[in-house]
Regions:
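Central regulatory/effector-binding core of bacterial HTH transcription factors
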Residues: 92-155
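Beta-alpha-beta core module
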Residues: 157-166, 171, 236-285
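Short helix-boundary/capping micro-motifs
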Residues: 12-30
């Protein structure tokens, strides 16, 4: 008997629900057909994966083992198309990047220009998206590299062992607001501690900056009298709304540095509310083509010289 990879999805559905009927509905098939597929998987393995005597159906010891192995197998299979492309394009000079929107506009262009003096670069393909989507592109080997904000205390969506990274720059999340006629912030964070409601502009769940901010400052923000007047996944959108005077937003200093210098935005809280950030370049640990490996080596050299000039 040959194993059908879709049986893993059947197993996962039943393991999650413990109910054959509900799992069959999730897999869009009749219960008898679903039960036959689970039985076929067990026959292929030579062991029972579920204790059918219990209600709901309970995963057996072998089933718990298979749950872990199956997850690893699915991750491995999902990565195969990207790895196949990597082998096929080993001699290609094209570099494929995924970068968050904020860094695509601010950090990436001058950083690439500086690296061009150290490495010969061919064409570059850039995908600009929210960090969650960028992580997915790297995990699926759709890109060679991902550039994103990071913080040492906040886990990214990528496993450190499988996705090594370099700190290639720094930034800072700064709470900012449009100024009033006297040059003072229209929306002050400390105002939320005195009973006044502070209007906030927030990041959505897909945002890497939002992930960092919620992890490090979320509890303190929740203690304030506040109201979110707008939520978005792009820092550039929050910047536009902040410039319009709608509320206070934590924005990357690389994005709003010119606004702060020209007085279009002002810092709206004390230094304790600011968050120092790393800018990290991520890659998959498996070997890429010569062009990508050459670029990684140049980035490593540049980073080492930046820390030890």
């Amino acid at each position: 008997m040959t194993m059908n990879l879709s049986w893993i999805d059947d197993f996962n559905a039943l393991a999650a629900t413990g109910n054959f009927s509900r799992a069959a509905d999730e897999r869009h098939m009749t219960q008898p057909a679903f039960s036959r597929r689970i039985r076929a998987l067990e026959e292929w393995l030579g062991a029972e994966l579920f204790d059918r005597r219990s209600q709901p159906a309970r995963v057996t010891e072998v089933g718990e083992w298979f749950r872990v192995v199956a997850q690893e197998l699915q991750v491995r299979v999902a990565a195969m198309p990207g790895e196949a492309r990597a082998v096929a394009e080993a001699s290609s000079t094209t570099l494929r990047f995924a970068a968050t929107h904020a860094l695509s506009f601010t950090f990436l262009p001058p950083w690439l220009r500086a690296l061009e003096t150290r490495a010969s670069m061919g064409p570059i393909q850039l995908v600009s998206d929210v960090q969650q989507k960028c992580e997915g592109l790297l995990a699926q080997s759709e890109v060679h590299f991902m550039l994103a904000h990071a913080h040492t205390s906040v886990r990214s969506g990528l496993d450190d062992a499988s996705y090594p990274s370099l700190v290639v720059g720094s930034d800072q999340l700064v709470p900012v607001s449009a100024p009033d006629d006297d040059g003072l912030p229209l929306h002050r964070l400390e105002g939320g501690t005195t009973g006044a409601i502070v209007h906030l502009l927030g990041y959505s769940q897909e945002s890497g900056l939002g992930r960092i901010l919620r992890s490090l400052k979320g509890p303190a923000i929740e203690r304030l009298h506040h109201q979110y007047v707008l939520t978005a996944h792009l820092a550039s959108v929050l910047r536009t709304v902040a410039l319009d005077g709608r509320g206070l937003a934590w924005l990357p200093k690389l994005l709003v540095g010119d606004d702060l210098e020209r007085g279009r935005l002002v810092v709206a809280a004390s230094a304790e509310w600011q968050v120092d950030l790393d800018i990290r370049l991520y890659r998959h640990r498996s070997r890429a083509g010569d062009a990508a490996e050459g670029f990684w080596a140049a980035a490593q050299t540049s980073t080492a010289q930046r820390h030890h000039p």
